[in-house]
Amino acid sequence: MFGVSMRTLISPSLAPFSLHLHKPSLFSTALRFSFSINNITPTNSPPSTISTRKLQTKATRVTSSSSSQPLSSSSPGEIHVVVGPMFSGKTTTLLRRILAERETGKRIAIIKSNKDTRYCTESIVTHDGEKYPCWSLPDLSSFKERFGFDDYENRLDVIGIDEAQFFGDLYEFCREAADKEGKTVIVAGLDGDFMRRRFGSVLDLIPIADTVTKLTSRCEVCGKRALFTMRKTEEKETELIGGAEVYMPVCRSHYVCGQNVLETARAVLDSSNNHSVVASSL
C-alpha cells in the first residue's frame, strides 16, 4: 500500500458497521450522509435488488447556480483523490463531496466510465441505491465536446469522476483541468485490482493531488478493517464488472488465506478438467 502525508477528506474510522448485516456495502467505513435536495428525481431507477431510496435533486447532468456569469480561470484548481477497495464507500464519498460543492453555489458535473453498467448507465449509483445523473463516457477527452466547450470553460466549477480506474487518459485530463482551467476535480476509484496490483492510472494522480483519502471497508469474513478486494470467481482478467456476487472486501489475513484456498480449488478444478480431456480422447 502507499503512504501519503496529506490531509484526508474524511475519517474512515468514524463509519458505522455491523457484522450482522448481509450487504458488504454496509460494512463501508465511509460516512453516511443525508441531504435535503428538492424537486427532481433522477431517471433510470436502480433495480429492486438495491435500496429504493433516491436523492432528490434539482440537477440533471449539470447543476447551475443562480449566477450564470462566466468563470474566472486566473487561479489553479484542485485535485482530490478517493481510493479504496470495493464496498468502501468511494461513490458515496464522491457524491457527498460533489453535492456539498453544489450547496455552496458551484456548478458541477459528474462523469463515470461507460464500462460500469451494474445499475444504470445514466447515473452514478451507490451500493445503497442513492443515485445522481452523470455523463457516461468511454474516455475523458470527449467530455468537453459533449458538454460544450463554452459551457465547460465558463459555466463549470467542479468535476466528479467515478470508476476512475477505467479511464486511460485520467492523468492528463485531471492535470489540465486543475492546472490550466481552474477546475476542482474529485476522483473516486480503485487503487488496486483483485491481485493487489495497481489498477489503471488512479495512483498516478497522487503526486499532483491536493488531498488523498484511503477508505477501508469491513472484512466479510471477520469484520476487521478490509483493505483489499477478493474475487470469488475463477475469471482472471483484470477488468471484470460485478458486485457482491463476484467480489468481497477482506482484511490482509483473510486475503492471504483466501487466495491460497482459491488457488488450491482452481488447481484441483484444472486437474479435473485435464483428466476429463484425456479420458475423452482415449
Swiss-Prot record:
Substrate binds at F194, T238, E239, L240, I241, G242, Y247. Pathway: Purine metabolism; Pyrimidine metabolism. Residues 45-76 are annotated as: Disordered. InterPro entries: P-loop_NTPase, Thymidine_kinase, Thymidine_kinase_CS. Residues 53-63 have a biased composition (Polar residues). GO terms for molecular function: ATP binding; identical protein binding; metal ion binding; thymidine kinase activity. Keywords: ATP-binding, Cytoplasm, DNA synthesis, Kinase, Metal-binding, Nucleotide-binding, Transferase, Zinc. Residues 64-76 have a biased composition (Low complexity). It catalyses: thymidine + ATP = dTMP + ADP + H(+). One of its GO terms (cellular component) is chloroplast. PROSITE patterns: TK_CELLULAR_TYPE (PS00603). The active site is at E163 (proton acceptor). Its EC number is 2.7.1.21. ATP binds at residues 84-91, 116-118, 162-165. Dimer. Belongs to the thymidine kinase family. This is Thymidine kinase b. It comes from Arabidopsis thaliana.
